[in-house]
UniProtKB/Swiss-Prot annotation:
Entry keyword Transcription: yes
Disulfide bridge positions per record: none
Name listed for the protein in its UniProt record: Transcriptional activator protein rec16
Entry's Gene Ontology molecular function annotations: RNA polymerase II cis-regulatory region sequence-specific DNA binding; transcription coactivator activity; zinc ion binding
UniProt source species: Schizosaccharomyces pombe (strain 972 / ATCC 24843) (Fission yeast)
Compartments (UniProt record): Nucleus
Keywords from the UniProt entry: Activator, DNA-binding, Metal-binding, Nucleus, Transcription, Transcription regulation, Zinc, Zinc-finger
This protein's GO CC annotations: nucleus
The encoding gene: rec16
Zinc finger (C2H2-type) in chain: 420-444
């Protein structure tokens, strides 16, 4: 009798404890949801009494299609063998594809922090990233740290990949004969392939010769066949305008594959029509008429190219405007100028087809960069027909990929506030103060054609106008 009574009491206690456990579980679920959502939501709690329904969600609100916000909680609460309080489902899902973040968000954060502190003691930070310290003690600590964790060591090491080959682009502002201004796009990498015999391992190498004054820049000798890398440190932001600069490039000129010892003698450069200038090309400092392709060893000269030089008679469509003369004294102090040469007249000036003008020395540095990027897209559009119009209308900074071109351009000539040409210089000045000191020695010329207030400049200030920059 006593044994039966004890058995009955034990069964009653087990039943009561299971009932309490079930009620406690439901109460925890109810309190959990009430703590997560404001009390203004009517949860419509309906307690379940059947044993088969234990573990199911007791809230009818989740069955309503008008409450999609609770679908995540409903999935967690209704899933059997899962507790809604441990957030197993959320924790098992990776929050990022970054391996460092995946390690940091690991469950055992204390172990990760210990690992990170150990690894930080093993490496020193410099310009090349995290570099290991050379000592026997550090090597021993490194092996100890690797044995304490299974996480990869490279997760904390900065991995620098070699940047893609830069597509050096030069944007030139060209003043046409009728006073209109236009932009010209040139890809320097296509030109750099012209001297593979001299610099086969330099993909960005460019020719520099004593007569190729447009390619003269610091760190390069004037010996025949000398090349240099456009991406070296000497092409930094010389004017502190936030732009990287390259060597000066005169559009309209094609390099030959090889130069002889006498420039333009047996390997004359090939000329391509690029400037819609005055149809008559005159010899320098003379009024003898247009220069033909046989004069001054110039090969395949296109008469549509305009030669600009000292005392050159520049005429517009009416023939009554002369290009102002500029004294060449200050050109020799800061690099070689485009229209100054020790050779006989009519060689590189005629061959290059004019002085390319850049508009980078202004208050609107970002505006100039946008102009260059927009013009580069125009030049690329005719070659890339697969690009959609939506991609072309998006600024490059917002749609840039790893293989996109890097726009590199510079300032020449430098324009003062009074809209005068300060100087034509293939090597930019190293600082603004040096430019201001040098500006006093510049021979100011008349206002450049095409820079009227209704064209490129606003009234009064002499800088790029908003109408010229807003079309982006």
């Amino acid at each position: 009798m006593d044994s039966d009574r004890c058995l009955t009491d034990e069964i009653s206690l087990n039943t009561l404890s299971s009932t309490f456990a079930s009620d406690n579980n439901l109460r925890r679920k109810e309190n959990f949801l009430k703590s997560r959502y404001p009390s203004k939501f009517d949860l419509n709690v309906s307690m379940l009494t059947k044993s088969d329904d234990v573990g199911k969600t007791p809230f009818s609100i989740f069955d309503s299609p008008s409450n999609p916000g609770f679908s995540r909680s409903h999935q967690m609460c209704s899933d059997k063998n899962k507790s809604p309080f441990l957030f197993d489902k959320i924790r098992d899902e990776p929050v990022s594809v970054d391996p460092v973040k995946l390690i940091i968000n690991n469950r055992n954060k204390r172990k990760i922090n210990r690992q990170k502190s150990r690894l930080q003691g093993l490496y020193r930070s410099d310009a090349n990233g995290l570099q290991p310290l050379n000592s026997e003690n550090v090597k021993m600590k490194k092996s100890t740290a690797l044995s304490l964790t299974s996480s990869p060591l490279n997760s904390w090491k900065t991995d620098f990949k070699t940047p893609p080959k830069a597509n050096v682009v030069c944007i030139s502002l060209v003043i046409e004969g009728d006073g209109c201004a236009s932009l010209l796009y040139e890809d320097l990498n296509q030109i750099s392939n012209s001297c593979p015999e001299v610099a086969p391992n330099r993909q960005n190498a460019l020719f520099s010769d004593e007569t190729l004054t447009t390619m003269f820049y610091s760190g390069v000798t004037e010996d025949e066949g000398s090349c240099n890398n456009l991406l070296q440190s000497s092409f930094g932001d010389d004017l502190d305008l936030g732009m990287q600069r390259s060597a000066t490039w005169a559009p309209g000129y094609n390099y030959p594959s090889k130069f002889d010892s006498i420039p333009f003698a047996s390997a004359s450069p090939k000329i391509k029509a690029a400037f819609p200038f005055d149809p008559n090309v005159y010899a320098l400092n003379t009024n003898d008429g247009p220069v033909t392709s046989t004069d001054n060893n110039c090969d395949q000269l296109n008469t549509r190219m305009q030669a600009w030089n000292n005392g050159f008679n520049y005429s517009n469509l009416n023939g009554d405007i002369q290009y102002p003369a500029v004294t060449p004294k200050f050109f020799q102090q800061e690099g070689r100028a485009l229209n100054v040469s020790d050779c006989n007249f009519g060689n590189e000036e005629i061959a290059y087809g004019g002085i390319p003008m850049r508009v980078c020395h202004s208050d609107s540095t970002l505006c100039d960069a946008r102009i260059a990027a927009k013009q580069a897209l125009k030049g690329k559009r005719q070659y890339d027909t697969s690009t959609s119009k939506a991609e072309l209308s998006t600024p490059p900074s917002k749609r840039r990929h790893i293989d996109d071109a890097d726009l590199v351009f510079h300032s020449s000539p430098l324009l003062s506030r009074s809209r005068f040409i300060c100087c034509y210089c293939t090597k930019p000045f190293l600082s603004i103060s040096k430019l201001q000191e040098h500006e006093s020695s510049c021979s100011h010329v008349e206002r450049l054609f095409g820079f009227a207030p209704n064209r490129l400049y606003d009234d009064g200030d002499g800088f790029l106008g908003s109408s010229f920059c807003s079309d982006w």
